[in-house]
């Protein structure tokens, strides 16, 4: 039985058999609907409550996570109780040791897996483009991770995490749309879809500031029939990544953060890191973002200009969205056949802490 790879993000869960040249077979929202009794209504009335197991990259509700994985592995992947296989999880930057152990415990004690491995998303994303060294800029739904990787090892002392991401950009977009469409009530799920359809980046800061009244308005009809107009708001979403003050943050833009992160690594690696920069995460697919990032990089004060890695032609489309999963599929083809993973015997002998010795 082929190993399964799972990349559980704050917004989407990606899962599937480890096939490195294909996209994950399952991509679904990382949320569960929980039915709870409404004490106020009485008569045993039940209401639905949406639960998010993963918040800003980390598992926060383990019961919901167990239910979600149960659905994924048995109802979708095709596992059968008593005949579970091997599994590899992707792991976000700065995952606490306790969470790694809890995941291993869940897999061995609840799902009875025959083998377990987890690896950091930054390393896996680079594997997806054939690199073992480079720097990843991962713009996820709930966080931004910047991680230099040298010879397959994340340089944690130089890495950075920001607790902002696609969800914060969605909220910003909603606020801006409300200003120009004050009579329209827009559901946040509609705003999310509008962001994916319309949000983009200006060529540079000067171009952004010049947009103003010259921006061609787009009229969009919402599912409920309301009509909204989208103008400069579509550019504000992307601009916030380069000018964080738009989000109310006193921080430098994303390119500056990349350069300062790499500057904290041993100088001999600077060129290798900056010249193998990889953008990943759903927000990295925003129209114009890659071009704007490279333009800003060309203007940076760094002695070595950051340049973006081009994905191999044989890799699936939307590599930025699925890079960690694809890298996991590549790694699974190595660690499990070569017995580098945590086995059931390892777990029974040592307990959950074995993951720190065998997974890196």
From Swiss-Prot:
Q: Does the keyword Nucleus apply?
A: yes
This protein's major location comes to nucleus
Q: Name one Pfam family in it.
A: Actin
Q: What does the record list as GO biological process?
A: anatomical structure morphogenesis; chromatin organization
* SMART domains documented for this protein: ACTIN
Highest taxon of the lineage: Eukaryota
Q: Name one GO cellular component term.
A: cytoplasm
Q: Where does this protein reside within or beyond the cell?
A: Nucleus; Cytoplasm
Q: Indicate yes or no for the key word Nucleus.
A: yes
InterPro entries with a match to the protein in the record: Actin, ATPase_NBD
Which PANTHER family does the entry mention?
A: ACTIN
Q: Which family does it belong to?
A: Belongs to the actin family. Plant ARP7 subfamily.
Q: What is this protein called?
A: Actin-related protein 7
Organism of origin is Oryza sativa subsp. japonica (Rice)
Q: Which gene encodes it?
A: ARP7
């Amino acid at each position: 039985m082929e190993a399964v790879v799972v990349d559980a993000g704050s917004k989407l869960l990606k899962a599937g058999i480890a096939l490195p040249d294909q996209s994950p077979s399952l991509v679904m929202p990382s949320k569960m609907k929980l039915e709870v009794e409404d004490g106020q209504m009485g008569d045993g009335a039940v209401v639905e409550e949406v639960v998010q197991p993963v918040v800003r990259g980390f598992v926060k509700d383990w019961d919901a996570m167990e239910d979600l994985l149960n659905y994924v592995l048995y109802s979708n992947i095709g596992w059968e109780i008593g005949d579970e296989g091997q599994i590899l999880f992707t792991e976000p930057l700065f995952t606490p040791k306790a969470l790694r152990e809890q995941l291993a415990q869940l897999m061995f004690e609840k799902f009875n897996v025959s083998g377990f491995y987890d690896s950091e998303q930054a390393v896996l994303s680079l594997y997806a483009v054939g690199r073992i060294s480079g720097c990843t800029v991962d713009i996820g739904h709930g966080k931004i991770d910047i991680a230099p990787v040298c010879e397959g090892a994340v340089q944690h002392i130089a890495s950075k995490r920001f607790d902002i991401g696609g969800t914060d950009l969605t909220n910003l977009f909603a606020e801006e749309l409300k200003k120009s469409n004050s009579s329209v009530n827009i559901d946040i799920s509609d705003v999310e879809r509008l962001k994916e359809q319309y949000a983009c980046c200006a060529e540079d800061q000067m171009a952004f500031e010049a947009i103003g009244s010259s921006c061609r308005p787009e009229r969009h009809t919402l599912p409920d029939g309301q009509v909204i107009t989208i103008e400069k708001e579509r550019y504000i979403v992307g601009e916030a990544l380069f000018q964080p003050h738009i989000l109310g943050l006193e921080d430098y833009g994303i390119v500056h953060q990349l350069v300062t992160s790499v500057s904290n690594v041993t100088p001999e690696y600077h060129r290798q890191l900056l010249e193998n920069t990889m953008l990943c995460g759903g927000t990295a697919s925003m129209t114009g973002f890659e071009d704007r990032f490279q333009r800003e990089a060309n203007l940076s004060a760094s002695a070595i200009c950051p340049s973006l890695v081009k994905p191999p032609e044989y890799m699936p489309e939307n590599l930025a969205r699925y890079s960690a999963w694809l890298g996991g599929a590549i790694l699974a083809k190595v660690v499990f056949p070569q017995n580098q993973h945590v086995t059931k015997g390892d777990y029974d002998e040592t307990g959950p802490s074995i993951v720190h010795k065998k997974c890196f």
